[in-house]
């Protein structure tokens, strides 16, 4: 995965609560085994009308949000069934960072595991960001190393992130590459196993 130390991009607001994984990526698109190409299916039932045309009423279809890479979402984002396809779809759509008051736990972890940064934001700070960015085409900088958001008005908002996931994102590690970093320690441990444990 690519390291994520700091990111500057346009922020889009999807101020809906309880957006579940079936709304993020509908179940009929889960048959593919590749991790790429899911972006065109993200929010499919909201993005397109019955004729397959873009729905002009859907928030993320608004011209001001085109090219957004930061999503300001509502409470309990990513709830519902566990599917890793949900962060795949959001990442392929172009989002690198998701800011919300709360996330479903499994979705929250899946974002980190797939190189995305989900930020749990206290409600008052989140509401402030929604007020700034709703229906606007504005940039935001998210500094993961210093755990700071620099908003469009020059304010700094701090955020919390688990040290383990922070290290993973900053260094671009996935679970396999992190395991390979410990290869020598693993070999040493295995060499010290009691003989009766050997197959």
From Swiss-Prot:
Pfam families per UniProt = Aconitase_C
Look up keyword ATP-binding and say if it applies: no
The protein's annotated pathway: Amino-acid biosynthesis; L-leucine biosynthesis; L-leucine from 3-methyl-2-oxobutanoate: step 2/4
Q: Catalyzes what?
A: (2R,3S)-3-isopropylmalate = (2S)-2-isopropylmalate
Gene Ontology CC, one term: 3-isopropylmalate dehydratase complex
Molecular function (GO) terms for this protein are:
3-isopropylmalate dehydratase activity
**What InterPro entries is this protein classified in?**
3-IsopropMal_deHydase_ssu, Aconitase/3IPM_dehydase_swvl, AconitaseA/IPMdHydase_ssu_swvl, IPMI_Swivel, LeuD
* NCBIfam families (alphabetical): leuD, PRK01641.1
Instruction: Family membership, please give it.
Output: Belongs to the LeuD family. LeuD type 1 subfamily.
Instruction: Explain the purpose of this protein.
Output: Catalyzes the isomerization between 2-isopropylmalate and 3-isopropylmalate, via the formation of 2-isopropylmaleate.
Protein name, entry field = 3-isopropylmalate dehydratase small subunit
**Which gene name does the record give?**
leuD
């Amino acid at each position: 995965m690519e390291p994520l130390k700091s990111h500057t991009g346009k922020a889009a607001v999807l101020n809906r609560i309880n957006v579940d994984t079936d709304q993020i990526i509908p179940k009929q698109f889960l048959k593919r085994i590749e991790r790429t190409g899911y972006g065109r299916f993200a929010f499919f039932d909201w993005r397109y009308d019955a004729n397959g045309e873009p729905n002009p009423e859907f928030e993320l279809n608004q011209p001001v949000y085109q090219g957004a890479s930061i999503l300001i979402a509502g409470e309990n984002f990513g709830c519902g069934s566990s599917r890793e396809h949900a962060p795949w779809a959001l990442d392929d759509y172009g989002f690198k960072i998701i800011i919300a008051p709360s996330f479903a736990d499994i979705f929250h972890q899946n974002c980190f595991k797939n190189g995305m940064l989900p930020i749990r934001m206290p409600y008052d700070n989140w509401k402030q960001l929604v007020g700034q960015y709703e229906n606007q085409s504005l940039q935001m900088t998210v500094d993961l190393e210093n755990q700071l958001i620099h908003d469009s008005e020059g304010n700094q908002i701090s955020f919390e992130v688990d040290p383990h996931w922070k290290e993973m994102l900053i260094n671009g590690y996935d679970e396999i590459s992190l395991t390979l970093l410990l290869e020598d320690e693993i070999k040493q441990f295995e060499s010290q196993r009691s003989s009766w444990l050997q197959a």
